[in-house]
């Protein structure tokens, strides 16, 4: 008789099971391995020794981190999908699909027909590690997050494809006072959405669904979100008793056909494998000796504020608060800038309570000895904190940091600030912030990146950072995304790298990311001669040293590098010149109360998720809004081309000049329909069709089509199309018109006039992936509007075949459609001209929003246009200016119409004093990878500022607000310099 051992080595846990010959479970164990994979496996086997000692056994290893161990120990290996399928078919034979979430992997296995599996690729969004990261962010354990989620009232949209993006969604929501219960449930919902959209890739998850893996085994809230989203009752949602160990059980079952050994022999082979390591690339050490490190410390410790004795000081004091995305910082200074009190800590998901606690501490410590004569706040939570505590002034982060940097280094020309999850770089010209770079899509070069690794390896961030300073062989981990880096670290550990080497390697990676991915520097001279580094991440000496080595020059790091935002705010508070601050006194703080309620604004189609913060004395602060409507203020109607174009296009439905006798023609309102709708609307109404547009885009429209999206990497505007066509089918239209169009009209401004591949051919993808389209006539022919004669011929033949329409009638309708399109373009040019004249008559600055025609969709731009006009800008679009400049050769292949327009508009902006350009970029846009650098180059060489706003299904505009205000601050500074 032999026993069967199944070992599942996952990315974060090891599972060991022992089965008898009848497949009864004799032993099971599930534990985190903290990257000590081989040691933990041996430890768990030792625990099973009472059962295994002296027995003949068959052993099989499975799991994402198991192959290396199996090879070293010469134990049989089975791929985890087969192991899981084996266990499911043995114990739950009528299963239709399995959803399994692990530490860093997620998979769906479909059992209908042949076995088909889908696994996550390079991204660990939506897995156990993602949930752990999010729990840390909220300041609770994963179990507490689960407990919280069960008491939710409202779900916020959160991106889960990437821990970084989720952080940038969650942090502002927390900072604006949202309930942790709602945030917890929203995190789980994000995991569900990621699994359904990212993994199912358009295939329906129906029938009997088995849920496996640790997260689904332990987290009730996650299970609830899956059941609700997939609409599964208790008979169809199966959560097996040993769901966390199913792959290990499957591995044990698979051992049937493998060799039999003495248990002691198998165990010894596993023990021996602990010492078996491979080879990892290494780099030179950060410091060659302790002396070199001491000299480095002496140099950097010289930059500090004046000394002041806080215990005896009496007089005026100035308070600066930096309510950052993950941390809260305070500085109380004397008039000469000497530090009286500082605070730097995580905001624990509730910045209001942290600052309340700190104000009490300040009043307790200083009592009547000081008078707070001024206060200022900066950072993500600026508006909330200003409102909560009646702070005197608020200022944008970029200005606060520059203010502090120039205090320590008056001639500073470049500032780099690396915080928890954001990285800001400012070029200083003429004593003002001139251009700003922020990390767009990824925080792999930021502080929370190292912190996450430190915690995963069981160290505090302080200890972990110190370990790398004198490491002899820093590991070369590349400069990639957090998730990829995870696998690099794991590989390095398997190859025997020490924690010291990994710590040093991570510091070097952070710097490479900052210099080459965010700043995109070709050389150190691109940055500047007088560089100041700040932000908590630079308090890490290893990161600072790596930065100096990478640039080949010394930089300035003030001793208070982590407090620079708060210090800059305190200096600003001092410069207000007040006698007494308005900030709540110790007496007023006794009555301080704060309650927050989530709600949805019904003021317009944006349906902003609002958080109403209520304070004592009837004060309230509303966050999440993109205009002043919910605040009771009247919306200032600044000229706005986004609104104008959108309203004009949405009106293009109905029977028009025809009678609608040929039926209802559905047109999905998305992508290039924002460019060509005037043509199609006129064509179909002239042919007596009634034009039915799909409803306005919304989160609901996205969710309606989410299950048919085959790739999670496509841009959000394309994803929305799935919901638009589903809605048209539901509306019962007679046909849906959505042609494939390789080309746009030739405007003579580029080397060619293509649509991007997604815009051009998305109709074919919809036809292949949206089953509902089989219920209607879906017309997606190839059409080229730019060749008038060919187009008329093509359409007249097509409509004769499909609808029996005489060719002559179609040709006449095509002529009318061209006239209508040309009239629309002419109207856009004229209106743009009119808006520019209005702006100049009123002395208002003009922002040119450069993007795609479909970026005017409020669901895609999330009301960014409202936000911009609320700051007093007149907003026009790139197509109102592009025709004013002729063709010019570019350094890149200029073959996409919409990009050509942006280049031309940027050239025109460079000739106008009162214009600045802001580029909208959809996350996942391939062609914009080229456009952004080219646009930056045109604008900066023309003396303009370059501002880019990345948009996606993420709706929180906190980061956008910072950018726009930074742009305004830079514009003001340039004016003053002149």
Model-derived features: positions:
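Adenine-nucleotide phosphate-binding core of ATP-dependent small-molecule kinases
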Residues: 166-197, 487-516
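An N-terminal assembly and electron-transfer interface module characteristic of large anaerobic redox
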Residues: 3, 120, 124-130, 364, ...
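Short glycine-rich, Thr/Ser-proximal phosphate-binding strand/loop in the N-terminal lobe
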Residues: 4-46, 116-117, 121, 321-361, ...
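Conserved phosphate-binding/catalytic loops in two-lobed NTP-binding clefts
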Residues: 78-81, 226-249, 392-398, 548-567, ...
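Glycine-rich phosphate-binding loop plus the immediately following alpha-helix
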Residues: 36-37, 113-154, 162, 244, ...
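Glycine-rich phosphate-binding/hydrolytic loop that grips phosphoryl groups
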Residues: 128-133, 239-276, 403, 447-452, ...
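Phosphate/ATP-binding catalytic cores across multiple sugar-kinase/actin-like superfamilies
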Residues: 186-207, 298-307, 505-528
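Glycine-rich phosphate-binding loops at beta-strand->alpha-helix junctions
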Residues: 65, 200-229, 242-244, 378-381, ...
């Amino acid at each position: 008789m032999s026993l069967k051992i199944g070992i599942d080595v996952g990315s974060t846990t090891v599972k060991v099971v022992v089965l008898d010959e009848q497949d009864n479970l004799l032993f099971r164990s599930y534990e985190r391995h903290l990257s000590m994979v081989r040691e933990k496996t041996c430890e768990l086997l030792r625990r099973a020794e009472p059962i295994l000692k002296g027995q003949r056994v068959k052993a099989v290893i499975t799991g994402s981190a198991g192959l290396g161990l199996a090879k070293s120990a010469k134990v049989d290996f089975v791929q985890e999908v087969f192991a899981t399928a084996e266990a499911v078919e043995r114990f739950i034979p009528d299963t239709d699909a399995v959803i399994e979430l692990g530490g860093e992997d997620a998979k769906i296995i479909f059992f209908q027909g042949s076995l088909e599996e889908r696994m996550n690729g390079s991204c660990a969004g939506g897995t156990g590690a993602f949930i752990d990261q999010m729990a840390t962010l909220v300041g609770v354990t994963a179990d507490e997050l689960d407990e919280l989620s069960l008491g939710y009232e409202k779900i916020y949209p959160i991106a889960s494809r990437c821990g970084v993006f989720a952080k940038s969604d969650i942090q502002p929501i927390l900072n604006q006072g949202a309930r942790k219960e709602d945030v917890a449930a929203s995190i789980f919902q994000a995991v569900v959405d990621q699994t359904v959209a990212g993994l199912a890739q358009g295939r329906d998850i129906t029938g009997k669904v088995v849920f496996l893996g640790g997260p689904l085994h332990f987290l009730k809230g996650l299970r609830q979100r899956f059941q609700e989203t997939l609409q599964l009752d208790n008979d169809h949602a199966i959560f097996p008793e040993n769901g966390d160990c199913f792959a290990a059980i499957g591995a044990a079952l698979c051992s049937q056909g493998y060799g039999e050994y003495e248990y002691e022999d198998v165990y010894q082979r596993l023990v021996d494998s602990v010492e078996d390591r491979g080879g990892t690339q290494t780099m030179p050490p950060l410091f060659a000796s302790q002396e070199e490190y001491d000299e480095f410390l002496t140099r950097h410790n010289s930059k500090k504020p004046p000394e002041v004795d806080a215990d005896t000081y009496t007089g005026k004091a100035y308070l600066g608060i930096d309510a950052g995305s993950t941390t809260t910082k305070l500085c109380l200074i004397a008039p000469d800038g000497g530090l009286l009190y500082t605070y730097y800590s995580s905001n624990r998901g509730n910045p209001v309570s942290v600052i309340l606690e700190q104000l009490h501490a300040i009043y307790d410590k200083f009592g009547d000895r000081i008078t707070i004569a001024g206060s200022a706040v900066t950072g993500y939570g600026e508006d909330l904190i200003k409102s909560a505590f009646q702070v005197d002034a608020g200022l944008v982060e970029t200005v606060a940091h520059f203010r502090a940097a120039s205090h320590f280094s008056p001639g500073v020309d470049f500032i780099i600030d690396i915080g928890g999850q954001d990285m800001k770089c400012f070029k200083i010209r003429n004593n003002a912030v001139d251009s700003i770079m922020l990390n767009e899509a990824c925080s792999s070069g930021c502080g929370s990146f190292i912190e996450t690794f430190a915690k995963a390896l069981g160290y505090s961030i302080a200890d972990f950072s110190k370990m790398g300073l004198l490491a002899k062989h820093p590991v070369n981990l590349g400069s990639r995304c957090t998730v990829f880096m995870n696998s690099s670290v794991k590989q390095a550990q398997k190859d025997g790298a020490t924690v010291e080497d990994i710590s040093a390697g991570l510091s070097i990676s952070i710097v490479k990311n900052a210099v080459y991915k965010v700043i995109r520097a070709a050389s150190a001279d691109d940055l500047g001669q007088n560089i100041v580094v700040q932000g908590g991440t630079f308090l890490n000496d290893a990161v600072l040293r790596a930065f100096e080595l990478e640039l080949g020059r010394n930089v300035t790091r003030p001793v208070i590098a982590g407090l620079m935002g708060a210090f800059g705010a305190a200096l600003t508070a001092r410069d207000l010149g007040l006698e007494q601050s308005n900030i709540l006194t110790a007496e007023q703080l006794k009555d301080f109360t704060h309650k927050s309620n989530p709600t949805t604004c019904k003021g317009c189609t944006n349906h902003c998720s609002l958080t109403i913060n209520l304070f004592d004395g009837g004060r309230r602060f509303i966050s999440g809004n993109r205009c002043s409507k919910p605040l009771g203020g009247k919306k200032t109607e600044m000229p706005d081309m986004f609104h104008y174009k959108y309203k004009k296009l949405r009106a293009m439905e109905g029977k028009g000049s025809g009678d609608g006798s040929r039926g209802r023609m559905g047109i999905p309102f998305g992508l290039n329909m924002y460019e060509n709708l005037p043509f199609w609307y006129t064509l179909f109404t002239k042919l007596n069709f009634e034009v039915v547009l799909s409803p306005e885009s919304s989160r609901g429209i996205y969710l309606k089509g989410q299950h048919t999206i085959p790739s999670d990497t496509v841009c959000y505007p394309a994803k929305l199309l799935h919901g638009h066509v589903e809605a048209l089918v539901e509306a019962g239209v007679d046909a849906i018109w959505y042609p494939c169009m390789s080309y746009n009209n030739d405007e003579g401004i580029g080397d060619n006039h293509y649509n991007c591949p997604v815009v051009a051919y998305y109709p074919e993808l919809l036809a292949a992936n949206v089953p509902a389209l089989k219920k209607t006539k879906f017309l997606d022919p190839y059409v080229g509007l730019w060749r008038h004669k060919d187009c008329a011929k093509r359409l007249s033949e097509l409509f004769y075949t499909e609808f029996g329409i005489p060719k002559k009638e179609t040709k006449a309708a095509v002529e009318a459609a061209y006239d209508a399109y040309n009239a629309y373009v002419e109207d856009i040019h004229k209106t743009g001209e009119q808006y520019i004249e209005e702006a100049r008559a009123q002395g208002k600055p003009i922002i040119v929003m450069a993007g795609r025609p479909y970026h005017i969709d409020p669901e895609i731009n999330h009301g960014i246009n409202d936000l911009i006009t609320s700051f007093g800008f007149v907003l026009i679009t790139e197509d109102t200016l592009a025709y004013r400049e002729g063709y010019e050769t570019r350094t890149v292949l200029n073959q996409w119409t919409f990009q050509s327009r942006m280049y031309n508009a940027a050239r025109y902006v460079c000739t106008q004093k009162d214009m600045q350009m802001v580029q909208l970029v959809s996350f996942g846009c391939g062609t914009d990878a080229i456009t952004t650098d080219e646009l930056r180059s045109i604008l900066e060489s023309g003396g303009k500022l370059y501002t880019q706003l990345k948009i996606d299904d993420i709706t929180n505009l906190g980061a956008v607000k910072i950018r726009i205000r930074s742009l305004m601050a830079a514009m003001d500074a340039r004016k003053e310099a002149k």
